[in-house]
Amino acid sequence: MNIKSLLAKPFASVVHRQIKKEQLTAVADQQSILNQLVKAAKGTQFGKNHHFDQITDYTSFKKAVPIRDYEGFKEYIEQIKKGTQNVLWKGLPLYLAKTSGTTSGIKYIPISKESISNHISGARNAILTYMSGSGNTDFAGGKMIFLSGSPELERVGGIPTGRLSGIVNHHIPQYLRGNQLPSFETNCIEEWETKLDKIVDETLGKDLTLIGGIPPWMQMYFDRIVERTGKPVIASFPNLQVLVQGDINFEPYTAKLWE
């Protein structure tokens, strides 16, 4: 067992215990967080338009802020894209996450400096909870491939903008950088087929233990591995143990990925 696997065990246990403890106060914690968010945002355009200064609990919040889709936020988003401050949150967002635009066009999702750590800790804690629950930490010392969008960002209204997975790539903890694949240069390739071939070049022959990404990207990667080697994926990566996915429904891809 390598040093990272040894260190991961006690750390995973501590995090898992803390999560289980927080489950006991989940409802009260949500009310507390709601109060904090409403208080912090009451001076924004959105807060003023929705009378945040009069919100005292979840019931009054629900009445003041009805559920809406992206179109209901679009007028606010357009202002943010022009560099207007204090629209949905204090100041300007740290990033704008841009969707692929496959349904209803490209959408821009503000990511505040207060929230970016949650994107990282959520994924980290999921893995640590798995470690604690299963007792399996061996994979922590192997190579980990994260299939993501390009980490290269453009600026919209002065705000760094790009795919959420590319944004998160900038915040991967330093202790995982040595395990991370593919390289930054390969991740920056925009054309998917070219990028996929480069990822295969960089990962074949490596001791891959974890893969993360959205199901269709993982499926295409595995298909390319089989195409390149003529062998099942497990023959190329016998120590591959953990698959981390998100963003879309996994079920339609289950049969193919488990082949």
What positions do the PLM features span?
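Active-site phosphate/ATP/adenylate-binding loop shared across adenylate-forming ligases
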Residues: 1-29, 34-51, 55-259
